[in-house]
Amino acid sequence: MIEDLKALLGLPEEIDGALENKLLLILKATKQRLRFLLGGLEPPEEMNYIILDVSIIRFNRIGSEGLSSHSVEGESLSWSENDFAGYMDDIRAYLD
């Protein structure tokens, strides 16, 4: 999954160890959170898209943790309080 994450982020296959470790940590934390939302069940392979999408969201927010929005020179960014909010219907459907 790390290779897919690098590709989606536009990173080369070979990256420095610190960045690779950061990506692995993001993937691990995202998978753990999804496992919690699934009531302790291991996320099935069909939910890998959720892990990847949320990992991208979390990677792009590095340095802005705790903020709900950010504006600089006319550019405004905002983040959901729950990175999984857009996937809750899929998660509920899986649990049903």
Segments predicted by a language model, with ranges:
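Short loop/turn elements at secondary-structure junctions
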Residues: 47-48, 52-96
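Conserved short "hinge" loops at termini or chain/domain junctions
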Residues: 1-47, 83-96
